[in-house]
């Protein structure tokens, strides 16, 4: 017998998260690790929980996540995006409040590439008039 589950892929910066929602008690597992031990920063944990808190369904689902690439901030954003998509798959009526909160839109900002002749993407070497 197969358990009902909802899937969502989330991306942010260079991170990609595969999120599975199953009806449960509210346990969030990231890469076979508890959420609180995976993310050191409280802000990253808050970001992950945002869509569930918005809909008041924090205790209704168990969340299983595999996330690759990027750093803690990008991974947290990718997980949030994946949870949002899975919640929309669960119930299309969730789309409107999640859209209003800005969780449905993929944050398209990426790191700007370093240019030749510059120190970083935009930082120029010191200019000397004489």
Swiss-Prot record:
BP GO annotations: translation
Keyword annotations from UniProtKB, A to Z: Ribonucleoprotein, Ribosomal protein
Xref: InterPro entries: Ribosomal_Su5_D2-typ_SF, Ribosomal_uS9, Ribosomal_uS9_bac/plastid, Ribosomal_uS9_CS, Ribsml_uS5_D2-typ_fold_subgr
* GO CC entries: cytosolic small ribosomal subunit
One molecular function GO term is: RNA binding
Could you tell me which SUPFAM superfamilies the record lists for this protein?
Answer: Ribosomal protein S5 domain 2-like (SSF54211)
Q: Report the sequence similarity comment from the record.
A: Belongs to the universal ribosomal protein uS9 family.
The entry's protein name is Small ribosomal subunit protein uS9
